[in-house]
Amino acid sequence: MLSRLLSGYASVEGRYDELLSAPGIPRPHWDAFLRSLAARQGLEVSETLALMESEMRENGITYNVYADPKGADRPWEVDPLPLLLSATEWDEIAAGIAQRADLLNRVLGDIYGPQELLRSGAIPPSIIFGHSGYLHQVQGIRPPGGVHLFNYAADLARSPDGHWWVVNDRTQAPSGSGYALENRLVVSRVFPQMFRDLHVQHLASFFDALRESLLRWAPKDVVDRASERANPLVVLLTPGPYNETYFEHALLARYLGFPLVEGSDLTVRDGCVWMKTVEGLKRVNAILRRQDDDYCD
């Protein structure tokens, strides 16, 4: 059955083949998935794909496309054939991305701090000071824990010899985590047995770490008088419903348990940010922004 499934598949010369290690031979981490897929009847596969599309529509998953003549809200689509990576390969990717994020955070800390990289000539000052993204207003600001780059993502591509390349850094308000979460939820409902058998690494630990980091870096002197325990208020700042990833903003706010706010929902008084509510102003202790930094004000 597996040979029939792969009968029409052909590798492209000069490209890395994610699926096969040799003609007709799946890579080890693909084998179980392909055998499970091959065991399904054609009608069953069609019904499964239809169920997946139905789940997406019912959940209202959209991606807003600016200036799209078909309308702003475009339904989100999930490729039924996933990209499978072995645990070993993913660990290598994760370590490399973490190292790159740490480097970029240190560079930001120096540029907005002592500027030793500029003084030494390692980075020409004209590149920094002439860049539209450099914000003179925040020069000298020291964020909690020295974390200038709180959230980071990278666009990856596979090289012809199988190595991974970073083709773009996402350092402003990287999107994708919410869509990845929704994809996982839909796929786990549509392919429950296959999802369990493949031992897919869960995403919950990432979102738990994100939530805990925001709460940890929030001021410690905020106390909820009712419970007499630290209870910082964290909000997720969105540009609004016309942003291309607004669905993700709403999803993340709900999943993390943070209020979703726009700029008009906030005000600044006595050097502090406050959220407007029907019960009055509530002090905000941390903001997870989903818009570019120069648009925050």
PLM regions: where:
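Preference for protein termini
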Residues: 1-297
